[in-house]
Regions:
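Glycine-rich loops and low-complexity Gly/Arg-rich segments
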Residues: 32-36, 77-80, 110-114, 131-136, ...
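Catalytic cores of large soluble enzymes that bind and process phosphate-bearing ligands
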Residues: 15-18, 66, 112, 176, ...
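Short, solvent-exposed amphipathic alpha-helical segments in soluble enzyme
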Residues: 24-27, 124-125, 160-161
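Conserved ATP-driven motor cores of ASCE-family P-loop NTPases powering translocation/secretion/packaging/pilus
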Residues: 74-155
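Active-site donor-binding loop signature of nucleotide-sugar glycosyltransferases
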Residues: 11, 111, 158
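Conserved P-loop NTPase motor module
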Residues: 21, 138-202
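P-loop NTPase motor domains
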Residues: 1-76, 142-148
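Accessory regions of macromolecular translocation/handling assemblies
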Residues: 37, 51-54, 60-70, 106, ...
């Protein structure tokens, strides 16, 4: 990450509790590294790339009725460390309001539930009268709101990722060599053990 390489964390095939713990521990380690560098070695922190953490099923981690996680802190206070949160969710109404307000750029796709549409339109500037428009969006269509620069809903098209990859077949992205699978597996086991310890303490 410190070299600007996009990293994907695949946590499929394990229990929901393990997925939750690993996701929180991984994000916490990376975000707090940026914070520590900012506090203790500012010149080296300036060399770090801006970090965007993309969180799938974000409502599971940002629900106000569940225990607070590192992702709330990232959205609310980590911007000054150049760490941002990209919260992906089909249930926006289950996102903590304070966090939702800090997500300035929103890409809104078709939303069936009236509860979620109401939450979006009531709590997103310049989207007050877009309930029907959100309901009528087709597959791959979205509305873009980006405060404070864009002060109206901009229609946009979302690429179908398999087609995107097909168009770039054979492109050499010159990625840095990956670590050995055995080394990554050992680190995953350590994170898993840390998650078990955290669960016992709670």
């Amino acid at each position: 990450i410190s070299k600007g390489v996009t990293c994907l964390v695949d946590i499929s095939g394990i229990s929901s509790e393990e997925q939750y713990n690993i996701t929180c521990l991984t994000a916490s380690s990376v975000a707090r590294y940026y914070k520590q560098m900012w506090e203790e070695n500012y010149s080296e922190w300036e060399k770090l790339p801006t970090l965007l953490i993309t969180l799938e099923e974000a409502h599971e981690f940002l629900d106000p009725n569940k225990p607070k996680t590192i992702f709330s802190d990232i959205a609310l206070t980590y911007r000054k460390y150049r760490v941002g949160l990209n919260a992906v969710t089909p249930r926006p109404s289950r996102i903590n309001f304070d966090v939702f307000a800090e997500l300035w750029t929103k890409i809104i796709m078709k939303t069936e539930l009236s509860q979620d549409r109401s939450y979006l339109t009531k709590n997103t500037p310049f989207l007050e009268y877009s309930d029907t428009e959100i309901k009528m969006l087709d597959v791959g269509e979205a509305l873009l709101i980006s405060e404070p620069r864009i002060k109206f809903a901009v229609p946009m098209k979302v690429l179908h990722y398999p087609e995107y990859l097909d168009e770039r077949e054979g492109v050499d992205y010159k990625l840095t060599p990956s670590k050995a699978l055995s080394e990554m597996d050992e680190r995953l086991k350590r994170i898993h053990r840390a998650g078990e310890s955290l669960s016992r303490e709670q």
